[in-house]
Regions:
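N-terminal secretory targeting modules
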Residues: 1-83, 259-261
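Conserved SGNH/GDSL esterase-like catalytic core that processes O-acyl groups on lipids
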Residues: 75-160
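Extracytoplasmic/secreted cell-surface and envelope-processing proteins
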Residues: 95, 154-159, 194-199, 226-227
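Sec-exported extracytoplasmic/periplasmic mature domains
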Residues: 108-112, 143, 151, 173-180, ...
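Conserved beta-strand segments of alpha/beta enzyme cores
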Residues: 116-118, 183, 213-215
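Active-site segments of SGNH/GDSL-like serine hydrolases
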Residues: 149-150, 173-204
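Charged helix-capping and loop-helix junction motifs
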Residues: 161-171, 199-206
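Catalytic His-Asp segment of secreted/periplasmic serine-dependent ester chemistry enzymes
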Residues: 195-261
Length: 261
């Protein structure tokens, strides 16, 4: 009889333990499901926000060449910086009031921390740039996009336009040989008052860009006409470079290109 009672009590204990475990699992299962559902919603919300940010950043790049915006999108997905180089003559200026700095600062504020910038300026003609192998500076940057002001004003009276254009081709070809997906944009230097032969040079530069399929950012559209003395208000006294107001004018044009409204 005692043996039967012991077996009975043991069975009761086992049943109680099993019932308690089932009850505990039932209590914890609901919070766990709720927690997982909450985490899923948070993750989904985060994904939606990231996608909206991605689309917004791409919309700012709407003016860019297709190959540039595509590469930019890929860099965004990989969370890698997109490298932009502004290169050319001393018309690039230096310091916070120069057009490269103004453009870069505005792009950083608009897009966020998604770019690496480099500014390369030279007091050289295009021929000197090529002969001194300064193109290696561009190659070392491994840029995704290069905005080149190709020394056209420095070449004025020193290098014939045919040679200038050949030099531009050599520069671009050398960079593309090293990194074939680099995208080039061309732009003129600053305008000058009462220009004559300089206008002929730039007509040829623009034609070269169009025939080569290279976007030509003609910021002269933002300046007074070259026959208007008012243009001197935007240039240094010797007309060799834009002054502070000229840099602002130049920068505003480029900002409108790099940051689509």
């Amino acid at each position: 009889m005692k043996r039967l009672l012991s077996i009975f009590l043991a069975a009761i204990c086992v049943i109680v333990l099993i019932a308690g475990q089932i009850h505990w699992k039932g209590k914890t299962a609901i919070p766990n499901k709720q927690e997982k559902a909450k985490e899923g919603k948070i993750s989904e919300t985060r994904d939606i926000a990231e996608e909206q940010r991605f689309e917004a950043l791409l919309s700012f790049a709407a003016n860019w060449p297709e190959e540039a915006s595509t590469a930019f999108a890929q860099k965004l997905r990989k969370e890698e910086p997109y490298k932009i180089v502004f290169a050319g003559s001393e018309a690039l200026g230096e310091g916070a009031d120069s057009w490269p700095e103004i453009v870069a600062e505005k792009m950083a504020r608009t897009y966020g921390d998604v770019f690496d910038f480099a500014f390369l300026s030279y007091d050289l003609t295009s021929t000197e740039f090529v002969e001194q192998n300064k193109v290696q500076d561009l190659i070392k940057e491994e840029a995704d996009l290069i905005l080149l002001e190709p020394f056209t004003l420095n070449d004025n009276g020193r290098v014939v336009i045919e040679t200038s254009l050949e030099n531009i081709e050599r520069i671009i070809d050398a960079v593309l040989d090293a990194k074939q997906d680099t995208v080039f944009l061309l732009q003129p230097p600053q305008p000058i008052y009462n220009a004559s032969w300089y206008l002929f040079q730039l007509e040829n530069l623009q034609r070269f860009a169009e025939q080569s399929g290279i976007p030509y950012l003609n910021h002269w559209e933002a300046w007074p006409d070259t026959k208007d003395p008012a243009i001197n208000q935007y240039l240094t006294n010797d007309r060799s470079a834009p002054n502070e107001e000229g840099h602002k004018l130049w920068a505003e044009f480029l900002i409108d290109y790099f940051i689509a409204n």
